[in-house]
């Protein structure tokens, strides 16, 4: 009975939200919306949405399951093929304070007008941008690991790949929303800068790995007050370059420069571990970090140690964030087309060091 009561409560609350959404839409369009061109539902559409909704509910994605059951046209009316990234309930209910218009924007931002299974996503190069149902807004495949068969979109982990695979609909579960939520902003959705806009391409539109100027990075660090970190990086540079060469899709790096290396000497066996923990395998400006959601992760040269973005207010965006417990105190100190250096407050901790 308790489970039923919980489901009924979810159904009731979302029904009210959808009612307000429908009424509000007739009065005013949100800033980033565009007219929806409906397509005719096939005879299989009702059963498709019902089957997908049941699958979501069984996997405890009850909020999205209810929305898909009550109003499938939100997700399925704009394209014959659809990929939906379902937000887990705990994160989804953090959106309860959003205006219904912006809630609809958020749902459209998590819906793609094409079918992409997990296999399809894993075949995409890191940095690939994908269109969404939200006008002029794209999401980015920020991390791809074919060995572990994991992927992240906008630095948000896909926790339930291929949760539903239908003839025209694919659903993946994600741990949180693809954008920080700003209930009082006229521009709710913050999209990533696509690497496809800034990186070199082959004639087949594939990303070309770049050569990182490590010597220049060491010189910049050394001449601007980060001597211990510069010495540490120089001491293990051969191993760092080897790491770089193993990332065939690497198009840039981010250096999180710490003012000290917790007294590690160049002979310390942990120096290499600490240094590579401070190097991210993509170029991220301060603005890129500020656009990330709470609990988003970023990859380092250490394949077993990701860094996590945390926010004091999960519904905020901007500079109120930390990276695995440290703050960026000197953002965008130095920047080139393939690297950026940020000064951080103190050395990142590594669990096993």
From Swiss-Prot:
Entry-linked SUPFAM superfamilies: FAS1 domain
Location, primary (coarse class): secreted
Stretch forming the signal peptide: 1-28
Keyword Phosphoprotein belongs to the record: no
Subcellular location: Secreted
Pfam family, one: Fasciclin
Gene Ontology cellular-component annotations: extracellular region
Residue span(s) of domain FAS1: 83-181, 254-352
Keywords from the named record: Glycoprotein, Proteoglycan, Repeat, Secreted, Signal
Glycosylation: residue positions: 51, 81, 94, 200, 249, 315
Entry keyword Signal: yes
Described purpose of this protein according to its UniProt entry: May be a cell surface adhesion protein.
Family: Belongs to the fasciclin-like AGP family.
Protein name (record): Fasciclin-like arabinogalactan protein 21
Species for this entry: Arabidopsis thaliana (Mouse-ear cress)
Organism lineage: Eukaryota, Viridiplantae, Streptophyta, Embryophyta, Tracheophyta
Gene: FLA21
């Amino acid at each position: 009975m308790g489970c039923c009561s919980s489901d009924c409560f979810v159904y009731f609350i979302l029904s009210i939200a959808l009612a307000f959404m429908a009424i509000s839409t007739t009065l005013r369009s949100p800033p980033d919306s565009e007219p929806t061109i409906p397509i005719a539902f096939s005879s299989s559409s009702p059963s498709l949405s019902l089957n997908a909704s049941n699958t979501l509910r069984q996997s405890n994605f009850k909020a999205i399951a209810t929305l898909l059951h009550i109003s499938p046209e939100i997700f399925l009316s704009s394209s014959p093929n659809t990929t939906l990234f379902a937000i887990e309930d705990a994160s989804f209910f953090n959106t309860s304070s959003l205006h219904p218009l912006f809630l609809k924007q958020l749902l459209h931002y998590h819906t793609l007008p094409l079918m992409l299974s997990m296999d399809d996503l894993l075949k995409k190069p890191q940095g690939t941008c994908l269109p969404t149902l939200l006008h002029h807004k794209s999401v980015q495949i920020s991390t791809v690991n074919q060995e572990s068969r994991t992927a992240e979109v906008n630095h948000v982990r896909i926790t339930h790949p291929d949760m539903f695979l239908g003839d025209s609909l694919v659903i993946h579960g994600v741990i949180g929303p693809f954008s920080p939520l700003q209930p009082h902003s006229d521009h709710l959705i913050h999209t990533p800068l696509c690497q496809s806009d800034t990186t070199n391409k082959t004639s087949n539109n594939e990303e070309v790995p770049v050569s990182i100027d490590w010597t220049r990075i060491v010189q910049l660090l050394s001449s601007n007050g980060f001597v211990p970190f510069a010495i540490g990086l120089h001491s293990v540079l051969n191993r760092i370059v080897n790491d770089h060469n193993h990332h065939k899709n690497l198009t840039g790096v981010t250096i999180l420069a710490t003012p000290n290396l917790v007294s590690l000497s160049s002979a310390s066996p942990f120096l290499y571990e600490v240094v590579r923990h401070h190097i991210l395998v993509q170029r991220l400006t301060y603005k890129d970090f500020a656009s990330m959601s709470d609990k988003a992760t970023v990859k380092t040269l250490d394949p077993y140690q990701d860094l996590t973005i945390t926010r004091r207010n999960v519904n905020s965006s901007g500079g109120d964030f930390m990276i695995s417990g440290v703050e960026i105190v000197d953002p965008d100190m130095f920047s080139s087309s393939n690297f950026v250096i940020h000064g951080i407050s103190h050395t990142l901790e590594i669990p096993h060091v």
